[in-house]
A protein has these predicted regions:
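Mature-chain termini and adjacent capping regions
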Residues: 1-164
Length: 164
């Protein structure tokens, strides 16, 4: 178990605030790219990355105004891709990687490339971290056969103070 709170993580109905240096909208491709010091916040979850790409589903298109530009969106996310220096935090839990993809329909996040999951002092490292939001669990996997490396965990037992 990762300790991630599935009720708070990537809520479908709560808005996501995204701040970046640049935004490009591609209506025909149904995607929006945010780049440069990108920070996405939803509730108590914060994602920082170099570039964030949002992909929308085809059906039920509607127009939304973002700044002065009107873009066509569906409101339903297909997936969100984060590339470069990915850092996801929620309360005392953080996960870092080179890339991450959130699949809304499957309610999972796949983080790849030097993935590290931290909770308090505990640290788990691997090539891939998969977070299953509906199941409130996560898997950390080793690298492929052609790459070296295994899953590494550093667990700190909790200090229990004894009262005299």
């Amino acid at each position: 178990q990762t300790g991630l709170d599935k009720k708070n993580l990537l809520r479908k109905t709560e808005p996501i605030e995204i701040v970046s240096d640049k935004m490009e909208a591609f209506q025909e491709k149904k995607m929006i790219i945010f780049s440069g010091n990108t920070v996405a916040t939803q509730g108590d979850i914060k994602l920082k990355t170099d570039q964030l790409t949002i992909y929308y589903k085809d059906a039920n298109q509607k127009k939304e105004k973002i700044g002065k530009q009107e873009i066509q969106t569906t409101g339903d996310l297909e997936r969100i891709e984060a590339k470069g220096n990915v850092n996801v935090t929620q309360k005392e839990i953080s996960a870092t990687s080179e890339e991450a993809v959130y699949y809304q329909e499957d309610a999972k996040i796949i983080m790849t490339g030097n993935s590290v999951l931290k909770q308090g002092k505990n640290i788990i490292k691997g090539c891939k971290v998969i977070i299953y939001l509906d199941e409130n669990r996560g898997d950390v996997q080793k690298c492929d056969a052609e790459k070296s490396g295994r899953v590494t965990a550093i667990i700190h037992p909790q200090d229990k103070k004894i009262k005299d």
